Amino acid sequence: MESASASEENEGGAAIEECVSRIPVPRPPSIEEFTIVKPISRGAFGKVYLGQKGGKLYAVKVVKKADMINKNMTHQVQAERDALALSKSPFVVHLYYSLQSASNIYLIMEYLIGGDVKSLLHIYGYFDEEMAIKYISEVALALDYLHRHGIIHRDLKPDNMLISNEGHIKLTDFGLSKVTLNRDINMMDILTTPSMSKPKQDYSRTPGQVLSLISSLGFFTPVGEKDQDSANMFSAPKSAAQLSRGFICPMSVDQKEPTSYSSKLLKSCFETLSSNPEIPVKCLTSNLLQCRKRLGTSSTSSQSHTFVSSVESECHSNPKWERDCQSTESSGCAMSWNAVEMLYAKSTSAIKTKTELELALSPIHDSSAIPAAGSNQVTLPRKCFREISWEARDPDNENMTIDKGQSGFCQSSQRSVNSSATSEEHLGKRNYKRNFHLVDSSPCQEIMQSKKNCTEYEANKERQGCRANQSTGLTTEVQNLKLSGCESQQLDYANKENIVTYLTDRQTPEKLHIPTIAKNLMSELDEDCELSSKKDCLSSNSVCSDEDRALKTTCVDSDSSFPGVSMMESSLEIQALEPDKSIRDYSFEEPNTEDLFVLPKCQENSLPQDDCHACIQDSSQVSAHPSKAPKALTSKINVVAFRSFNSHINASTNSEPSKISITSLDAMDISCDYSGSYPMAVSPTEKGRHYTSHQTPNQVKLGTSYRTPKSVRRGAAPVDDGRILGTPDYLAPELLLGTAHGPAVDWWALGVCLFEFLTGIPPFNDETPQQVFQNILKRDIPWPEGEEKLSDNAQSAMDMLLTIDDSKRAGMRELKQHPLFSEVDWENLQHQTMPFVPQPDDETDTSYFEARNNAQHLTISGFSL
């Protein structure tokens, strides 16, 4: 019995597994699944082909991405896709799929075999009044539906009116349409779009169709290049981005395969780091105060614990380098306290054997640069700011020291790391250089500015290493500041010689004291120290490399606008809205602290386990007790600009408004305000609340209210480019005059179509477009006379639609009340018999499109996409 029941359970489990495995995952189809039957027509922005998939015919509109980019029409392709996806009207062409490849965009629509009205008009010459009324009535219903859903067609003409198998009219070609949704469409927009009542016709879409219609259209996909880094930049998990709390950068080093090199590098760095707790004293650039005086700034102190970051949009002098190494969640990004204690135990025994060494953890490395197992050294890239290049060199000996004979920033930052755990499969490329195939700006400006800054730095090189202990009153001292077990070190300042020196004091577990923390006027070595999870806490020694410091040193100013502000944050909780990620590759997303171990970039001294447990109890809280502050701090405190040596300190920085504005931390929320520019603007918003646990309570006592400027939107609001788009004969006067326009432009075009239906010629037709425009502005209409005279009702209806003043122009309500449309059954119009019903030879017949193609001298014979 037991064996029988067990067999039944096994059979049942197998059946369930088989059933589950058969469930297909919804996905958009590939364009390869469609077979091209023949070309249909060609327009200004693409070609239309007759395609087939699964026995069903489709009209496939193919648009080249390169053409759209060259014509600056990328947003119009998006608008056309959105307009067709949102429309569920029997008088609008139905869109099934929106697909794309590396070079093309494919809009898969229903195929209407009757051709377009322009071709039919060429055959008929002109329409009878009854036929014209029916066509105009159906187009009016389509326009009314579109306008109620915030869509303006803006290119209404007989060429864009297709005839269905039953002879009804359907609008197409929304390439110049305007969708007032002001955001990307989502699944709910497509699923809940109201549709006009039409029995026996279903407008529902399959999951694959919905996924294709809400996908983002990428116009900058490199053709013919399968760059794994570019793909991982957008599709891979953001572990590397979370490690740096940074943003996706346009530069990267090619990486063949993602390996576990990150975790091994981190572990080896921690081991070497523990044995080298000191970092060499480095003198930073000394002309900050002179530059600030020249620029008319007067910041005196720094109270902000959070610095805001953005890309330097003017010259990209401080690019954020992408960390190409993507580590998995199981690669050991989270370290427990036991691992920290082991690292700390090694540090006490290795201090005497290691010389003073500056460890530079390069943000760019290649997995092929790891030597074989048993090797004692790993060469990391050395960055030389004078040559602006990355190189990989073999070390001469095991213990590498800084070559102080080099001038400027051309100093070696090589290091030696024990890598006995690495495998032999990583032997390969060495001596690689930085590539620029993903860079959208020339590095000439960076080279020139770096040379200029190096010259200025050499002039002040003699003052390096100066230690100043005087208190200048420009800084505040805070004691007992705990950041999740990360103990900051003591900083001293000097203002007399305009020199800022970074000093570190070696701490031992036997002799620990409460350090004083002060803010640097221009701390190139200060980096963000992120909080780990409540269970995992970091207390090992780590240093920031010269590469990271040069790339992430910030420039924040409270009273002047500097381009290129970068952000370093310690523990301030950033609450940011998530903008559209298809444009925009930058985000302020919080990392997953349960699975992520962030390597701090600031020099930190080890804490005993007892001190760290005190921090683990509530890692989200930061307690700080301000000591006696200087007298200068009792007045209004401004935010001090932080400028790195590599940034453009002497450049004209007032040419672009700053994307960042900083307010007091006790009442600040950071919100993202997308202004249509790159990068997105970030502005704080006053909330009128008490400081959070992540903010310094010292600022609450100041009593000064830092108010955000009321004009929080940075940059100009998105507006039309002012170009006149459309066919000249059907353009409304407001489009020609460049004034604001709305749905009334479609009703003007409908009046032009009514005149053309009844006469065969547009009312403002002339020899040149300029003459056509003059006829439109003068409203010069050649009314037929004699036997060809139009009826009074038809002429009256055209007069209402062709009104110069768009506010007085007729709309749907006026047309329904007009005598010309008195006999139209508006509710059942789609069920009435039409005067022309197509009679094709077969289902693939495209002869009804030939009349228009011949009139425009189009030869449709090629299959090239």
UniProtKB/Swiss-Prot annotation:
Ranges for domain Protein kinase: 34-821
Catalytic residue list: 155
One biological process term in Gene Ontology: DNA damage response
Binding-site positions, ATP: 40-48, 61
Encoding gene per record: Mastl
Protein known as: Serine/threonine-protein kinase greatwall
Primary localization: cytoplasm
Job description of the protein: Serine/threonine kinase that plays a key role in M phase by acting as a regulator of mitosis entry and maintenance. Acts by promoting the inactivation of protein phosphatase 2A (PP2A) during M phase: does not directly inhibit PP2A but acts by mediating phosphorylation and subsequent activation of ARPP19 and ENSA at 'Ser-62' and 'Ser-67', respectively. ARPP19 and ENSA are phosphatase inhibitors that specifically inhibit the PPP2R2D (PR55-delta) subunit of PP2A. Inactivation of PP2A during M phase is essential to keep cyclin-B1-CDK1 activity high.
Modified residues (Phosphothreonine): 206, 221, 508, 708, 727
Family of the protein in this entry: Belongs to the protein kinase superfamily. AGC Ser/Thr protein kinase family.
Stored InterPro entries: AGC-kinase_C (IPR000961), Kinase-like_dom_sf (IPR011009), Prot_kinase_dom (IPR000719), Ser/Thr_kinase_AS (IPR008271), Ser_Thr_kinase_AGC (IPR050236)
N-acetylmethionine PTM sites in chain numbering: 1
Keywords noted in UniProt: Acetylation, ATP-binding, Cell cycle, Cell division, Cytoplasm, Cytoskeleton, Kinase, Mitosis, Nucleotide-binding, Nucleus, Phosphoprotein, Serine/threonine-protein kinase, Transferase
A GO term, aspect molecular function: transmembrane transporter binding
Lineage: Eukaryota, Metazoa, Chordata, Craniata, Vertebrata
Top EC group: transferase
Reaction(s) this enzyme catalyzes, per UniProt: L-seryl-[protein] + ATP = O-phospho-L-seryl-[protein] + ADP + H(+); L-threonyl-[protein] + ATP = O-phospho-L-threonyl-[protein] + ADP + H(+)
Listed GO CC annotations: centrosome; cleavage furrow; cytoplasm; nucleoplasm; nucleus
In-chain residues carrying the UniProt-annotated modification Phosphoserine: 362, 442, 545, 619, 644, 655, 711, 861, 864
Domain AGC-kinase C-terminal residue range list: 822-865
